[in-house]
């Protein structure tokens, strides 16, 4: 059932994570749990401590081949040439991301409902979950553009109206991730610190930010402080491995100037107890293919 942003008690509209401010603001220590369910495994303990957990061989080699063919099909699909869900590189015009991929691919639609996938999110979030966002990311060799340091929750809170960081992302690698081909960098433990960002959100900001984000990113001073406090590590591994990470963990990736491309399936699960309201720091919500307002549990 499709639901619109619902009216809530005024207490739910208290902004506990203010951002997009006129002036730099102090960091905010996280006010919410990092694992909402019981911590009863080493994997959940690692997630609680670091804000992420790596799973080897989440997909079999056969599944990797099937999904790789599927994402290549979507990137080449001429019927999607003018589709808003397809985001292209700012300079090369190559496909960068395809959003709402679970509605474009029956294979992905089946994958997101499998217990081995959605069960991970339920464990961390301690509730039923729904899909906040799905997409495929492409980083071609030589000209693949990275993502600057950011917290996903900062954007989802400011522009989608997500009240709390009670959401998790699952990035499933469809290609080998090396330290040198733009693999994701994360700051272990940074999910416990919310970094307010400076600058008002323009109307339709998503049209530019999905290609190159300049508003809603931390300052170099912020990144320096966090890196010194938490350090930086990389998600590397064979195709089929996956990274489950907290919505507020600080992460980013460098450009890929190697011949080795990267691609991944990116799934975002939000708790049904954390459904979207009106944006906290934007003129209007982003389109539903970016921030879903269908809160039907999986």
UniProtKB/Swiss-Prot annotation:
Q: Where is this site: Important for ectoine stabilization?
A: 156
* Classification via SUPFAM superfamilies: Clavaminate synthase-like
Essential cofactor(s)? Fe(2+)
- This entry's Enzyme Commission designation comes to 1.14.11.55
The answer to whether UniProt assigns keyword Iron to this entry is yes
Q: Does the keyword Iron apply?
A: yes
The region called Disordered is annotated at: 1-26
Q: Which domain of life is it from?
A: Bacteria
Q: Where does L-ectoine bind?
A: 133
Q: What reaction(s) does this enzyme catalyze?
A: L-ectoine + 2-oxoglutarate + O2 = 5-hydroxyectoine + succinate + CO2
Q: Which keywords fit this entry according to its UniProt record?
A: Dioxygenase, Iron, Metal-binding, Oxidoreductase
Enumerate composition-biased segments (Basic and acidic residues): 1-18
Q: Any idea what job this protein has?
A: Involved in the biosynthesis of 5-hydroxyectoine, called compatible solute, which helps organisms to survive extreme osmotic stress by acting as a highly soluble organic osmolyte. Catalyzes the 2-oxoglutarate-dependent selective hydroxylation of L-ectoine to yield (4S,5S)-5-hydroxyectoine.
- Family statement drawn from the similarity comment of this UniProt entry: Belongs to the PhyH family. EctD subfamily.
PANTHER family the record matches: ECTOINE DIOXYGENASE (PTHR20883:SF48), PHYTANOYL-COA DIOXYGENASE DOMAIN CONTAINING 1 (PTHR20883)
**Assembly, per entry:** Homodimer.
Q: What is this protein called?
A: Ectoine dioxygenase
């Amino acid at each position: 059932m499709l639901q619109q942003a619902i009216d809530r008690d005024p207490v739910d509209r208290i902004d506990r994570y203010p951002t997009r401010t006129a002036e730099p603001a102090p960091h905010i220590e996280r006010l919410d749990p990092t694992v909402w369910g019981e911590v009863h495994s080493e994997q959940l303990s690692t997630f609680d401590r670091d804000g992420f957990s790596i799973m080897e061989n989440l997909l079999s080699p056969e599944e990797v081949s099937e999904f790789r063919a599927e994402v290549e099909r979507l990137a080449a699909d001429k019927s999607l040439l003018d589709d808003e869900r397809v985001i292209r590189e700012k300079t090369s015009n190559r496909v960068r991301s395809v959003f709402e991929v679970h509605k474009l691919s029956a294979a992905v639609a089946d994958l997101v409902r499998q217990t081995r996938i959605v069960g991970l999110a339920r464990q961390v979030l301690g509730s039923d979950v729904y899909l906040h966002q799905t997409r495929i990311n492409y980083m071609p060799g030589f000209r693949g553009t990275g993502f600057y340091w950011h917290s996903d929750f900062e954007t989802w809170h400011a522009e989608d109206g997500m009240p709390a960081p009670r959401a998790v992302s699952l990035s499933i690698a469809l290609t080998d991730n090396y330290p040198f081909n733009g693999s994701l960098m994360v700051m272990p433990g940074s999910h416990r610190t919310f970094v307010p960002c400076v600058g008002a959100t323009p109307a339709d900001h998503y049209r530019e930010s999905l290609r190159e984000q300049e508003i809603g990113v931390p300052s170099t001073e912020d990144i320096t402080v966090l890196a010194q406090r938490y350090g930086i590590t990389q998600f590397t591994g064979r195709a089929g491995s996956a990274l489950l990470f907290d919505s507020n963990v600080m992460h980013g990736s460098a450009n890929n100037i190697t011949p080795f491309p990267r691609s991944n399936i990116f799934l975002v699960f939000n708790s049904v107890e954390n459904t979207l309201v009106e944006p906290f720091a934007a003129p209007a919500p982003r389109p539903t293919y970016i921030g879903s307002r269908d809160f039907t549990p999986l």
